[in-house]
Amino acid sequence: MEWPFYSSQIIETNNLELLHAILTCGMPNQFVSPWHHEKRTQEFISKISMVENTLIVNDGYLLKSPTTEFLDASEKSVNSYYLGLIFTKLFSMKEFQVDYFLHTTLFEQVYGKDALICNGRKKPAFVGYQKESKSWSIWESTGKRDMAPKALDDAYNQVLGIKSVNDESPEYAIACMTYFDTKHGELQGIMRNASVGKKANMIFDKEQFLNLYYRHICELFDESLRRKPFDSVIDYIDGYLEIELELFGLNVDASDKDDYLRRRRLKLGVPKDILGFFQYNHGRYGNNQTLTSIVEALDVNPAEYQEDNFFMGRDGIYFRII
């Protein structure tokens, strides 16, 4: 399966789906430093700022921003790398109904080098999980400034040959590359689905997988409680809690004189039971309660809540604009 979007398929998305992908594909400092849950909010906002500074919308299409021409080569490469991560996550969610998407580097960073085993083969960058079908998928992302066939081939070879994930054949083994069209500056992508391999097996713990996925998101709530201990977390939807995040800049509206209302704000929501697991893991949930059992018991129905200013993923994480 391979297609450039401009000739075969146009994938439509909105800013809330993009925010969800930015939050759940990994944080910048996760790749260069140990866990530091005093900086989760800054990490998330910095990722949003990077995307806003790199992309513009023109006639409904995402284009490369002219301001990127003032960046040096290394800065452009970093931006392209993160765009590859973010949009691979977005494509997996929209086109392949992947509910959970995690960078495999985090296993070693948090749980040690034996937490994820790939039979001596270099592991793919991402592993995905679909809750309803209980199926795994593997992904390799690469982000480039221009079309780079060799980079796509390298990503394809990274997922090629994987026989199983936790003793199950992967539903997909996909290499994805994002890049900017040299003629119009449009953001485009190519995806290739590799055949099932015969040798390498990926083995890791599902409980650790889910813990890594939700942990940094719940740490945003911890930060919010430390900043505003009494009124920062509210119950907007039954079974969920949400916090308010303030982005850089203002909503420019000359008629609005209220400084608070002009601020760019959005709400992030998480199921109460998942927050409770991380905050009271050995309290009311008991020592035998697992995150896996909590996630499997969640009755998430995103279609019930979807509105123009609201988006909920199948992982139960939602954003709403206020």
PLM regions with names:
Residues 35-41, 65-74:
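Low-complexity, highly charged intrinsically disordered N-terminal segments
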Residues 142-204:
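Catalytic cores of nucleic-acid endonucleases
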Residues 79, 88, 110-129:
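Catalytic micro-motifs at enzyme active sites that drive phosphoryl/nucleotidyl and oxygen chemistry
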Residues 1-58, 240-322:
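Nuclease-adjacent, charged terminal/linker segments that flank catalytic cores
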Residues 185-257:
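C-terminal amphipathic alpha-helical segment
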Residues 67-93:
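A short, highly charged nucleic-acid-interacting micro-segment common to nuclease
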Residues 94-118:
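A short acidic/basic microdomain associated with nuclease active sites
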Residues 124-147:
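Conserved catalytic cores of phosphodiester-cleaving nucleases, focusing on short active-site segments
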